[in-house]
Amino acid sequence: MSETPSTPPVPAGPEPGPVSRWLNQQGFEHQLLDPDHLGVEVIGVESMFLQVIVAALKADGFDYLQCQGGYDEGPGQQLVCFYHLVAMAEMVAKMGVGDSSSEAAKVREVRLKVFLSREDIPSLPSIYGLFRGADWQERETFDMFGINFEGHPHPKRLLMPEDWKGWPLRKDYVQPDFYEMQDAY
């Protein structure tokens, strides 16, 4: 009895979720990424399209910016900015109806990611005009990773002193040997 050699299955890419399908119907280009560990849809967008896509998602019911942040993929790799949007008004409306079924209780949420080169000064448009809650979150991301948010009304450090050199959460950050302490106010 001879067995025919089997070829290993080719791993399929992520399946487009409801938000990705909606963005495709609206004509928005985006990159489909693997969902997170909770099954939340994750979508990659180009920095120049960020404001337009966020505005479209807000018009489609994603009315709450749950969080915005950044991370460093490692030395020589990209910096990533992420935005987690939730359809909060829909969730509250479902709670008011009293429908406790698992499908009705499911919150519509999506995470957008923007991948940035660490060369020069990484920048992308601020979404402060769409979500006021982005104010301190974008400032913290600037402060820790050096990502500039164009159009932000308060583009200054949030946690570190204004004269601090470097971006402390970048993986290529070199910690200074000496800190000059200033007097308490």
Curated annotation (Swiss-Prot):
GO MF terms listed in the record are: NADH dehydrogenase (ubiquinone) activity; quinone binding
Which InterPro entries does the protein's record reference? NADH_DH_suC (IPR010218), NADH_quin_OxRdtase_su_C/D-like (IPR037232), NADH_UbQ_OxRdtase_30kDa_su (IPR001268), NADH_UbQ_OxRdtase_CS (IPR020396)
Q: Kindly state which reaction or reactions the protein catalyses.
A: a plastoquinone + NADH + (n+1) H(+)(in) = a plastoquinol + NAD(+) + n H(+)(out); a plastoquinone + NADPH + (n+1) H(+)(in) = a plastoquinol + NADP(+) + n H(+)(out)
Q: Which PROSITE patterns match?
A: COMPLEX1_30K
| Family statement drawn from the similarity comment of this UniProt entry | Belongs to the complex I 30 kDa subunit family.
- Task performed by this protein: NDH-1 shuttles electrons from an unknown electron donor, via FMN and iron-sulfur (Fe-S) centers, to quinones in the respiratory and/or the photosynthetic chain. The immediate electron acceptor for the enzyme in this species is believed to be plastoquinone. Couples the redox reaction to proton translocation, and thus conserves the redox energy in a proton gradient. Cyanobacterial NDH-1 also plays a role in inorganic carbon-concentration.
Spell out the protein name for this chain: NAD(P)H-quinone oxidoreductase subunit J
Species assigned in the record: Prochlorococcus marinus (strain MIT 9313)
Report the gene name.
ndhJ
